[in-house]
Amino acid sequence: MAKRKYKRDSKIPEYEFYILDDVVHFILKGRAMVDGTYAAVNMDKWLIISKYEWFLGKSGYPVCYELGKIQLHRFVYTLILGTCPSGLYVDHIDRNKLNNTDGNLRLVTPQQNSFNKSTNTNKKGVKKISDNNYMATVVKDGVRRQIKNIPTEIAAAEIYNMMAEELFGEFAAFNKI
């Protein structure tokens, strides 16, 4: 498959956007325009960001191909503090890939980033082990912590949330109950 080359047009892209509390919310280009998917950045970054075309990538992150396929949260971080140190990731605190405001981005280790992962099932750390028994599991530093024989899935999710908060602190991803 041939690589597509993106040629920089001298024309600055036009965006549909609105400003709320010093945050610019703008519709991403491409398929996101049909859905009306908005990304958010601080006003002081907007003048630089708006010079490029930002698309909604397959991973759900806004991405710019003109800059060598960089994701928006990484680009914003470089505008704030410069290059991301080797071995660290730029993480969205609220886990919203479209919220790229300064206060929502932080540097994390790969392990901290893994604590903050979401699941599609809303049963993070919960497994059914028999008809009326569930298990809550948390793994940190290669050590598995489990509580078994929990009567309901909701109770197991609540127990997982408590264990995750204790072990992962601000990096914990919780089940919505």
Where are these regions (language model features)?
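Conserved recognition-core residues within compact binding domains
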Residues: M1-Y89, R95-L167, F171-I177
